[in-house]
């Protein structure tokens, strides 16, 4: 290590595996921004389920080892690289796709995936914007092509992506149904845009959804746990209805005939398949929502950086998650 290099704390992964492979190191060199990059002093970083899949080595996208996890950060610009004109040192920002990893005291981000963080939102809320809200936008408008007047069922609506989906869908004129695993979770979902919420732990909750949807069925289902719900989802859809798969933790057997009579679709979502133009569209939706006040990130569990392994354990195994999980730095 060269003399004079600035060091930081960061979580590093040297091998794929369980949460225990997340190692806190205090001698990681602070990266320098290259052309069209910014260096962010991280105040908060979001924790997303996909980061546990990547860490385990079971995800389609495998980073080169060692690496630092994390995509969503909010903080203050520390320095900027050549060609950056939109930001300067001291600016409050959030980003959804770090270059160097977000579980760290400093993170690099491309200037075109970095956005101003309004004073109306704190850093924790800023770290809850990126992946949840951009994923919700892609699921609703790119994958489902949802339209005002349609109905949408959001499974796992009390989590980060679920709440973002409810807020966005309600603001765009959809009838919003949600599921949650507790009375507290149901209340939170109602407060964030849903017209009606069902407890997915109740044995007859599917029947209650059918009653609410009526003979037509549900136009769009945003599915956070396809390996559990997909078969039932297909029975809830309207003619031409769409199941949008945002999350899945295993396999499931379905009957393809359930898609035929009503000509329904199952569509997967991959946020990072979005084009630059699509990301700009999603950012515009968020900006409008922030200005109008309906984008309201809800924060759930908070952990210090050194508890990242516990956060990964909890985000997968804790039932009835509410809000966005955050690492505080």
Curated annotation (Swiss-Prot):
User: Which UniProt keywords are present, listed alphabetically?
Assistant: Acetylation, Cytoplasm, NADP, Oxidoreductase, RNA-binding
Gene Ontology molecular function, alphabetical: identical protein binding; mRNA 3'-UTR binding; NADPH binding; NADPH:quinone reductase activity; zinc ion binding
Report the domain of life of the source organism: Eukaryota
Provide a GO CC annotation, any one.
Answer: cytosol
Keyword Metal-binding recorded: no
Q: What is its EC number?
A: 1.6.5.5
Please state what class of enzyme this protein is: oxidoreductase
Residues that coordinate or bind NADP(+): 53, 158-161, 181, 200, 229, 246-249, 269-271
* Residues bearing the modification N6-succinyllysine: 296
| GO terms, biological process | protein homotetramerization; xenobiotic catabolic process
Sites bearing N-acetylalanine, chain numbering: 2
Summarize the protein's role: Does not have alcohol dehydrogenase activity. Binds NADP and acts through a one-electron transfer process. Orthoquinones, such as 1,2-naphthoquinone or 9,10-phenanthrenequinone, are the best substrates (in vitro). May act in the detoxification of xenobiotics. Interacts with (AU)-rich elements (ARE) in the 3'-UTR of target mRNA species and enhances their stability. NADPH binding interferes with mRNA binding.
Listed name of the protein: Quinone oxidoreductase
Organism, per UniProt? Answer: Rattus norvegicus
Recite the lineage of the species.
Eukaryota, Metazoa, Chordata, Craniata, Vertebrata
Q: Supply the gene name.
A: Cryz
